[in-house]
Amino acid sequence: MLLKKRSPTSILGTLALTGIVISSMIGGGIFSLPQNMVASASAGAVMLAWMLSGIGIFFIANTFKTLSIIRPDLKAGIYTYSREGFGPYVGFTIAWGYWLCQIFGNVDYAVITMDALNYFFPPYFAGGNTIPAILLGSLLIWIFNYIVLRGIRQASFVNIIGAVCTLIPLLLFILITARFFKFSIFKTDFWGTAPQHTLGSIGSQLKSTMLVTLWAFIGIEGAVVISGRAANLSSVGKATILGFSGCLLIYVLLSLLPFGSLFQYQLAKIADPSTAGVLNILVGKWGEVLMNTGLLIAVLTSWLSWTILASEIPYAAAKNGTFPECFAIENSKHAPSFSLFMTSGLMQITMLLVYFSSNAWNTMLEITGVMVLPAYLTSSLFLVKFSLSKKYPKQAAIKARIAMITSLLGSLYSLWLIYAGGLQHLFMVAILLALGIPFYVDSGIRHKQEKTFLNRKEILKMTIVALAALLAIFLFSANKIHL
């Protein structure tokens, strides 16, 4: 029997789940926010961008919270919501795409970690793709593999410590920039329209800034993905909202406070990680060292979180036959051992791509970043569908009308995110998703679920994805679209 009874060691509380959400969202990119946000935008545009993004992501976060309350039977969130709402193939596709996204994302963390180490040990890890960097990055892959194999609860405890250590330098940055904040500097050219430093229209500034905020909340689904290991399913919704609110507040303060101590054109010239550059100007070398240390801790912590999430989705999909049954194997610590080894093994292989072709790797990262977005859309659409059905519980704390409005707005924002990701990337996503079709068909046959997995509706869905992939191959080969 592959599926074992749950052990208390697998149970996670609100604090552990919130730690997963925060560390999943806060990666190394947050330490570059000041420069990234102001490169072509004023303080006013940055403020508007965070407000709009915050509202949009709130609807997605609230969708996850609502679903965890009204459908507590659906574990592993984004996968089971998609399967329940739109059939086994859509569920498989979401799981497959999310899994690939996590694998490539974790290898990116390896690259960023090595590049961050280069600040302390130049030039051995420059660019994150030298031989020493590949060797140490590979070692870290298997160290994280070992930590998660020791049990999800133990790994989440390590993750909480890492999240706290990540937040400390960020909070110090906020306190220091608040100390040096001058409103007279902050309000100078608030909308970026001064002739000597014109940044274009508010619309163009907003567009460039929104593309940065677009990726800041990837990982908000963390608690939902591992909801099957939650001590109380109400903790899943609480952790999602707490993580979202905390990260949004940090993002806003981190982006806006530097406008009160340095002018926009000064901030735009600071090299990444720009938090280090800002503190170097304000307080000296120790501030730069602090931020680079924080960057290193943040990336390692986020890497651990994504390792947990990457192994959990195939495990959950295997439990009901969508992925091969071997992915459901657990070890004595109730960790998804086979899924974890397979994930780490693919990450190890992918590390070679980083060494041999950094350009190809950067392109792949842009593509896989888009692959997580359909999961937000299908989850939101599932709540729309369920809130309009007679199955919606009448005594639910969240009324059906509120759930429908929230999920509809979440769906619209998810569509915007997918559109903003770029058409060329969507076509490449279609190719990667089509690669999973043989595995889906094989799972259906092995589990003797042909009537469910391979009926006309599911075959039609597979055909649409396959045709989209063929169209993408044609357009790329004919140079009609480019990455």
Swiss-Prot record:
MF terms in GO: antiporter activity
Cystine crosslinks: none
UniProt cross-references to InterPro entries, sorted A to Z: AA/rel_permease1, Amino_acid_antiprt, APC_superfamily
GO annotation, biological process: amino acid transport
Key words of the record: Amino-acid transport, Antiport, Cell inner membrane, Cell membrane, Membrane, Transmembrane, Transmembrane helix, Transport, Virulence
Keyword Transport included in the entry's annotation: yes
GO cellular component: plasma membrane
Pfam families per the UniProt record, alphabetical: AA_permease_2 (PF13520)
Cellular localisation: Cell inner membrane
Main location: membrane
Protein's UniProt keywords contain Transport: yes
Transmembrane region(s): 9-31, 46-64, 85-107, 127-149, 156-178, 209-228, 241-263, 293-315, 335-357, 367-389, 415-435, 458-477
Membrane-protein topology: Multi-pass membrane protein
Family: Belongs to the amino acid-polyamine-organocation (APC) superfamily. Basic amino acid/polyamine antiporter (APA) (TC 2.A.3.2) family.
UniProt function note: Catalyzes the exchange of L-arginine for agmatine. The arginine uptake by the bacterium in the macrophage may be a virulence factor against the host innate immune response.
Protein name: Arginine/agmatine antiporter
Organism annotation: Chlamydia trachomatis serovar D (strain ATCC VR-885 / DSM 19411 / UW-3/Cx)
Lineage, uppermost ranks: Bacteria, Pseudomonadati, Chlamydiota, Chlamydiia, Chlamydiales
Gene: aaxC
